[in-house]
Regions:
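Short secondary-structure junction/hinge motifs that connect adjacent elements
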Residues: 27-43
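Extreme N-terminal tail/first-helix region
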Residues: 1-24
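Amphipathic, well-ordered alpha-helical segments in soluble domains
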Residues: 17-24, 59-62, 114-117, 121, ...
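A short, mixed-charge helix-start or loop-turn motif at secondary-structure junctions
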Residues: 3-7, 42, 97-101, 138-142
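Acidic/histidine-rich alpha-helical segments that form the ligand environment
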Residues: 84-129
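Short, contiguous alpha-helical
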Residues: 38-86, 90, 124, 129-172
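Hydrophobic packing residues in well-ordered alpha-helices of helical domains and bundles
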Residues: 7, 11-14, 49, 107-111, ...
Length: 172
C-alpha cells in the first residue's frame, strides 16, 4: 500500500494493516508469545511477540499524546520526553518495560483501545489539518500518524509472518 496522502487513505491503511495484525496476533499460541526469538528493534537484539505488541502500544500511545498536547496548545517533545530520535532502541526497551505486567490478551486489548482513540482523533480532523501543512519539521500530522500506526503495523505483520514461518506456526 502506498503512503497515505489523505484522511480517507490514512484511515484505510490503518484499518487494513491493523485488521491483519490483530488476526495474526490472535493466531499465535499464548505459550509462544514470551519467546525472545524474533528480530528486535535494536540491532543485534531479539524480542518476543509480547515485546512487539508493547512497542506498537507505546508508539500508538505517543501519537495520542502528541495530538492531545498539540490540541491543547502544549509543546510536544518528539519522540518522547527524555528521548531523542537517535535513541529509539532505548525507547523500545522502555515500552517493553512499561507494559511488562500486562497479560498478552490485555496488551492486545490496550492496543485496540489506543488504535481506536487514534482513529477518533483522525476523524475529528480535516484533510487540511492532517495533510495541509508541516506539523513536525517537514512532516504533516497525517504523515506522523502514518509513521507510527499503519507503517509499523505493516512492518509488524512482516515480522510476525517471518517469525511464524521459522516456528512452524500458522497465522491463517
Amino acid at each position: 500500500m502506498s503512503v497515505p496522502q489523505t484522511k480517507a487513505e490514512l484511515l484505510l491503511a490503518i484499518d487494513k494493516n491493523f485488521s491483519k495484525l490483530i488476526h495474526y496476533l490472535n493466531s499465535i499460541p499464548s505459550e509462544m508469545t514470551s519467546d525472545d526469538s524474533m528480530e528486535g528493534h535494536a540491532k543485534g537484539t531479539e524480542m518476543s511477540v509480547r515485546d512487539l505488541v508493547s512497542y506498537l502500544l507505546g508508539w500508538n500511545s505517543l501519537v495520542v499524546k502528541w495530538i492531545t498536547f498539540d490540541a491543547k496548545g502544549q509543546s510536544v517533545d518528539f519522540p518522547e520526553t527524555g528521548y531523542k530520535w537517535n535513541q529509539l532502541g532505548l525507547l523500545a526497551q522502555k515500552f517493553y518495560q512499561d507494559y511488562s505486567a500486562l497479560s498478552y490478551d490485555s496488551l492486545i486489548a490496550e492496543l485496540q483501545t489506543v488504535k481506536n482513540e487514534i482513529v477518533q482523533l483522525i476523524n475529528e480532523r480535516t484533510d487540511d489539518v492532517l495533510y495541509g501543512k508541516p506539523w513536525y519539521t517537514k512532516w504533516t500530522m497525517g504523515r506522523m500518524i502514518s509513521f507510527n500506526t499503519s507503517s509499523p503495523y505493516a512492518n509488524a505483520n512482516g515480522r510476525l509472518r517471518k517469525w511464524a514461518k521459522n516456528k512452524n506456526i500458522s497465522l491463517k
